[in-house]
Amino acid sequence: AQLFAKAMKFVGPIRKALQFPTVFNLLGPLVNPSQPKCQLLGVANLDQMRLYRQVYQKIGIDYGIVNSIDGYDEISLTGDFKVTTNDYERVFRPEDLGFAVASPEELKGGATEEEAKEIFDAVLENRALPAQKNIVLANAAFGFQVMEKGSKSIEECIDIARESIDSGK
């Protein structure tokens, strides 16, 4: 956020020093300087999901909001996850989408920026662990569904995401 929203540059050091979530964590997606017309947002809990849903409905954005019930602020595939969009609200299981349940150990993001970059590159180059790839596929698929305004099924959107990664495009 500090790279794109100039005002956040001044708040960043204070937020880091506090070492706990602040109101700026909630405001960040709402003050995006690019003013997106659609957005997929991961939230840490169901209270945040309800809050963002109400705000997005009022401002008229096409949205998808996701939360893994076990606390991840994205679709982690470690268990059930909830998705709410302009069109529906539903709890999914990884198996509903044809994915295996992932273990938290398979989600390690890397302790350094370089390790995180390596995982990112591995996903894009189709050499990531199956769980890492599946998590990206699931999150990307719901993002595609938001962009398509619900005109495609989630299964079609998973296929689009898979084709994109597998083809390297």
Task: Tell where the protein language model's regions lie, with residue ranges.
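Glycine-rich anion-binding loops and their surrounding alpha/beta cores
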Residues: 1-169
